[in-house]
């Protein structure tokens, strides 16, 4: 069934997200800055992917975009607007995004910052009632393999006038 398939995708993404935390911070320390996304990359609305944040610089590749690559096992494709509830929740789940880590050039996040988060973590936060707001224009279409567009749209700071119809497999 569709729900079972969704649960399998969510479980796989959640496990990958947990394992990707160290990989992502390692990539951050080694990846050169890039200021533009590939024009072929699309957001959840099937439009060109927009920048999530340049300050702090976010994204698995730390280029400001929530582009998902084959190396990004955690699917860091959701452009989320940090708030105190989500920062506390993700810290309680083992991913402290609020404490600076100068060794990794990580400034620590505060409420209002935009950050690319794992699709699985966003779903966990949604299930726990603490999902942060999202920027649909800056969230990768790749997250739709494990998240529902309707759920993202309900938390959007940039809700569309209408949602594109879902594509059937």
What are these regions (language model features)?
Residues 98-105:
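Short alpha-helix capping/helix-loop boundary micro-motifs
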Residues 122-145:
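Short, compositionally biased
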Residues 24-26:
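N-terminal signal peptide c-region/cleavage motif recognized by signal peptidases
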Residues 32-85:
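Extended boundary segments
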